[in-house]
Amino acid sequence: GVYVIEEDVATYTIK
C-alpha cells in the first residue's frame, strides 16, 4: 500500500 497524508498532516491512511 501507499501511505497518503490526509487533511490532518499527522494522520496517515493506507490507500
UniProtKB/Swiss-Prot annotation:
Subcellular location: Cytoplasm
GO cellular component: cytoplasm
Assigned keywords, A-Z: Cytoplasm, NADP, Oxidoreductase
Catalytic activity, EC: 1.3.1.-
UniProt keyword Manganese present: no
A single MF term (Gene Ontology): oxidoreductase activity
Family the UniProt entry places it in: Belongs to the NmrA-type oxidoreductase family. Isoflavone reductase subfamily.
Annotated protein name in UniProt: Isoflavone reductase homolog 1
Organism: Pseudotsuga menziesii
